[in-house]
A protein has these predicted regions:
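Catalytic core of pol beta-like nucleotidyltransferases
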Residues: 1-34, 43-48, 58-113
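Short, well-ordered beta-strand segments
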Residues: 53-55
Length: 113
């Protein structure tokens, strides 16, 4: 089950403000349902060279997902931190397999208000 995280400072340390800004921009995109951190940062074992893995779940038609991915890629380009972002449909959470299983098990939903 995906846990909720609102403590950006505790998770991202010195990159907290940048990540909050990036998540706010992602959250402003049409059809975004949730932003989930997964990988080493979510498991609490990130190293200085670790990338930041984000899964963004959308409520949109398949035809729109490619466009949303392009928007995500533009938002997440950052010279300071390595962000790897993947778009998914929310229906993929209903029967998780593969990477969705990891996201479901270890993921932290990043909420920004």
């Amino acid at each position: 089950m995906i846990s909720v995280c609102e403590d950006f400072n505790g998770v991202f340390g010195r990159n907290a403000a940048r990540m909050r800004d990036i998540c706010q921009k992602i959250g402003a995109l049409p059809d975004v349902n949730k932003i989930v951190l997964f990988g080493s940062y979510a498991r609490g074992c990130a190293q200085s060279e670790s990338d930041i893995d984000l899964a963004v779940f959308f409520d949109c038609q398949d035809a729109r997902l490619l466009g949303r991915y392009r928007q995500l890629a533009r938002i997440c380009v950052n010279p300071v931190i390595d962000i790897q972002v993947q778009p998914f449909h929310t229906y993929e959470l209903a029967t998780p397999c593969g990477i969705i299983e990891e996201i479901e098990t270890y993921g932290l939903e990043l909420r920004v208000y």
